Amino acid sequence: TIYRHDIKYSGEHTDSKLARVREKMKELDANAFFLSSLPDIAWLFNLRGDDIACTPLFYSYAWITIDKCFLFLRKDCISAVAFQRFKEHGISILDYTEVSAFLKDQHETVLLNPDLTNYLHYNLLFKCKIIEDKNPTELMKAIKNDIQIDHLKACHINDGIAMTKFMY
């Protein structure tokens, strides 16, 4: 199951995050960005899942252009409401198994992190000019917004209380 990570926890809408990614793409002269890092995809789209035990991650890939966005995931794991919400925001949901065929047909200047892209997908992009760089989402994820900072503080307080009760 894939579910929405509420804005009251993330502090930023997907549209805003995508706009920041697209700005970074423009800086690097890329007109597409291939994202295969599961934590980055979960963060970018404010989604969580249970495909991988003991993590909030789900199997997925993302292809982002200046004006379009494609999210590849198991369609049977996302609700009709979430599917419609993404459609309204210009995000196309495609089946996880379609990513290879999709990549084979691309001719863009693509930003990707070769350390996080598997060999098959990297080679399928042979028609593309590839810009190898870190995922812009890595740094964006690391810089916390005010809501995230408030939640981190609350977690540390609760953790401190639990440790104190445990020790005494």
Regions found by a protein language model. Give the residues of each.
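Active-site neighborhoods and metal-handling regions in enzymes and metal-associated proteins
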Residues: 1-168
